[in-house]
Amino acid sequence: MELIKIATAGSVDDGKSTLIGRLLYETGALKSDQIQHIEEKSAARGFGYLDLSLATDGLLTEREQGITIDVSHIFFSTPKRRFIIADSPGHVEYTRNMVTGSSTAQASIILLDARKGVIEQTKRHFFVTQLLGIKHIIFAINKMDLVNYKQEVFEDIKTTLNNLVDKHGNKDVSYHYIPLSALYNENIVNRSEKLDWHKGEALLDLMKAIPVESNKANDGVFQIQYVIRPKTEAFHD
């Protein structure tokens, strides 16, 4: 069975953890006790829906603050492919963690909030993927439910992204653009009737179609995020 690692990127509150939680839920990767825990926590917070972001926030601080700080690696599978998803933080101060999570990825999903469009953190994460040489980029315009699933909103964002790619993108990279709503499972596992103007595939189908390249050239590589050294004359910095 094929194995592919995909990193997530995007600004804070763009919905990365919710998207991954949705993928886990819809592919049957969550156990019954995990679902029960999410149901209880969602109800306790007064939500009328499942807060699937809880499926990925592992640290106590993350659970308390409702944010992602460290990189979480999540596993799920379909009949023909296994996935490792790196859930990376969106806050600017945790960009280093995002770089670490993306450093071994074969593809990246860059999420955007449909209400905000392309912002500074979107561009920053895009540049990181180009620097790391990631060959497959999916721009996922999330929260389309909050803009009434309007095609013109998606097209405006896509045009801005295309301009960014044309100016700064690597030529040997494949770029994809997809509108979705992770919260309501629109265009995640199956094509959405509310987004029927979009003729492309659902997100999971797109993820399953990404070519898996051999990583033999990287065998033996050990990624290091930060080196702590003694403060001496030999190592003064």
What annotation goes with each model-predicted range?
Residues 155, 162-237:
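Conserved catalytic-core segments of large NTP-driven translation/proteostasis enzymes
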Residues 24-28, 39, 43, 60, ...:
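Signal for well-folded cores of large energy- and translation-related assemblies
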Residues 19-23, 37, 97, 121-128, ...:
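Alpha-helical scaffold elements adjacent to nucleotide-binding pockets in ATP/GTP-utilizing enzyme cores
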Residues 16, 32-33, 119-120, 146-151, ...:
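Switch/connector loops and helix/strand junctions flanking conserved nucleotide-binding motifs
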Residues 2-93, 105:
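P-loop NTPase switch module centered on the Walker A-proximal segment
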